[in-house]
C-alpha cells in the first residue's frame, strides 16, 4: 500500500510571508507551488522550487484564479477561454523556474475556487484538463476524488491522482464542506489522523452527517497555510509509516 503526501507551498508574496515551508517540505513527497495569481511571486517560486529539489520532493503547479486579496478562494465569473489561458500562463511560469533548476513539473493541482469549480462543473473541469494536456500530456492532474476533475482528466487522456484531505470535512456526496461553514476545517489532530487512516486503508470517509462515502486516496493534502499544518504533516507521516504504508510521490 502506498500514498503520496502533498502540501500547497510557496504562497508567500512580496513582503507577506506565512506558512512553514522550510519545516514542512522535508516531510512531504509532493509540493504544489503557487504560480503567482492567488499567491506566490517570482522570488518565492524560485526559492520553493530550489527547496523542493534540495529535499527530493516532486514539484507540481498550483494555479489559481487572479485573486490575491481573496487568496484565490472566491468564485470569479470567468470565461472558459480565460481559464484555459490562465492555466497555460501559470504552468509556463513554473516551468521556467523548474528548467533553471534542472527539474520537470510532475503534476498540476488547481487551487481554491478554481479547484472547486472544476470539481463541480464538468465543462470547467474539461477546460482545465485540456489546458494541462496541451501543455504537457505526461503531467498528472490532481483533483478531488470522485469529482469531474478526475473524470474529465481521464477523458482527455491524462494520468490522474485522486486527492483526499486530512484537514477538511466532507459532504454526503463526497464534496468538501464549504469554508463558509464553521465546521469545514478539521483542527483536532486525532480526528485528522483517524480520517486519514480510514481514507487510505478503507477508501472511505465519514461525512459531516455521519454517512460513509467511498473514495480513492492516491494523495493526501494538508494545507500549508493551516494553523496546524506542520503538526498535521509530521503526525500523518509518522502514523502512515507506523502502519507500513509507503509514502511516495506521484
From Swiss-Prot:
Disulfide bonds: none annotated. One of its GO terms (biological process) is carbohydrate metabolic process. Its EC number is 3.5.2.9. It catalyses: 5-oxo-L-proline + ATP + 2 H2O = L-glutamate + ADP + phosphate + H(+). Keywords: ATP-binding, Hydrolase, Nucleotide-binding. GO terms for molecular function: 5-oxoprolinase (ATP-hydrolyzing) activity; ATP binding. It comes from the Bacteria. Belongs to the LamB/PxpA family. Catalyzes the cleavage of 5-oxoproline to form L-glutamate coupled to the hydrolysis of ATP to ADP and inorganic phosphate. NCBIfam families: PRK05406.1-2, PRK05406.1-3, PRK05406.1-5. Forms a complex composed of PxpA, PxpB and PxpC. This is 5-oxoprolinase subunit A. It comes from Staphylococcus aureus (strain JH9). The gene is pxpA.
Amino acid at each position: 500500500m502506498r500514498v503520496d503526501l502533498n502540501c500547497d507551498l510557496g504562497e508567500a508574496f512580496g513582503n507577506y510571508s506565512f506558512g512553514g515551508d522550510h519545516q514542512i517540505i522535508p516531510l512531504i513527497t509532493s509540493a504544489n507551488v503557487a504560480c503567482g495569481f492567488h499567491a506566490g511571486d517570482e522570488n518565492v517560486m524560485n526559492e520553493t522550487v530550489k527547496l523542493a529539489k534540495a529535499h527530493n520532493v516532486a514539484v507540481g503547479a498550483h494555479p489559481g484564479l487572479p485573486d490575491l486579496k481573496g487568496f484565490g478562494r472566491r468564485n470569479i465569473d470567468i470565461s472558459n477561454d480565460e481559464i484555459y489561458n490562465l492555466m497555460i500562463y501559470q504552468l509556463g511560469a513554473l516551468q521556467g523556474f523548474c528548467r533553471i533548476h534542472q527539474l520537470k513539473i510532475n503534476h498540476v493541482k488547481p487551487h481554491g475556487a478554481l479547484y472547486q469549480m472544476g470539481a463541480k462543473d464538468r465543462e470547467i473541469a474539461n477546460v482545465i484538463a485540456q489546458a494541462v494536456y496541451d501543455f504537457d500530456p505526461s503531467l498528472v492532474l490532481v483533483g478531488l476524488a470522485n469529482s469531474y476533475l478526475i473524470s474529465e482528466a481521464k477523458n482527455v487522456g491524462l494520468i490522474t491522482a485522486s486527492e483526499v484531505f486530512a484537514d477538511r470535512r466532507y459532504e454526503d456526496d463526497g464534496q468538501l464542506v464549504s469554508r463558509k461553514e464553521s465546521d469545514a476545517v478539521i483542527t483536532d489532530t486525532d480526528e485528522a489522523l483517524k480520517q486519514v487512516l480510514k481514507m487510505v486503508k478503507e477508501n472511505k470517509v465519514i461525512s459531516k452527517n455521519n454517512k460513509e462515502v467511498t473514495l480513492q486516496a492516491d494523495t493526501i493534502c494538508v494545507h500549508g497555510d493551516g494553523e496546524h499544518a506542520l503538526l498535521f504533516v509530521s503526525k500523518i507521516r509518522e502514523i502512515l509509516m507506523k502502519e507500513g504504508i509507503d509514502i511516495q510521490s506521484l
